[in-house]
Amino acid sequence: MSQSAMQEITCPKCGKKTSFLVWASIITMENPEIKEKVRNDEAFRFHCPECGASALLNYNFLYHQQEDKVLIYVSADGGDTSDMAQILDQRGNAFDGYRKRIVRSYNAFKEKLLILDAGFDDRIVEIIKSSVWDNVEAHYKDKKIDEIYFATNDDGVHGFLFRRAGEMVASMEFDESLYKAIYDSAYERLDAATKNDLYIDRDWAKDVVERMG
């Protein structure tokens, strides 16, 4: 079941202490209203009743979207995730057939949700993003891009956002024809080789491209 607890939060602006609901695990079928609040950040946004300041709180939690068989563990503090990886890697339980992921930041978690909502496979998206990274480093190193994220705008158009020091500096449209070409030509082989992989990120993409050729 979903697990949460009230914790005392100190406002970063005025210093007032206020109770805030912190989630250890979220199950969307038990809390349907939380699904949208996760996506618009309100599930994790602290609002100070004293001064009106707001802040997005980053902490570790497990996200369970049961209706789509998705489990994502968010290691927002960047700590060791080996214990959670061992748990998620277990077989022969109710989570067989799930898409299980471990991400190391809140932004990476939000990206996984956007990819899920768009109906794409995050492994193929990550492989495409890896080639985008290669192009950026070969031709635009002076731009000092340090993050690239999949995103969807208000019109439903998918793309990649390029960030530097936390600020968006550029974007490009997502090539759905390339996605389809990779899916059609390599999905079965990719799925057979990586079905149980938990960490689907840039390092994973570089490794799997080298392995699969």
Functional labels for PLM-detected ranges:
Residues 1-77:
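N-terminal cysteine/histidine-rich coordination modules
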Residues 47-132:
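Domain-exit/linker segments immediately C-terminal to small folded modules
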Residues 133-213:
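C-terminal, charged low-complexity interaction regions
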Residues 13-17, 35-37, 69, 100, ...:
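Context-gated lysine
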Residues 31, 40, 58-60, 93, ...:
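Detector for Asparagine
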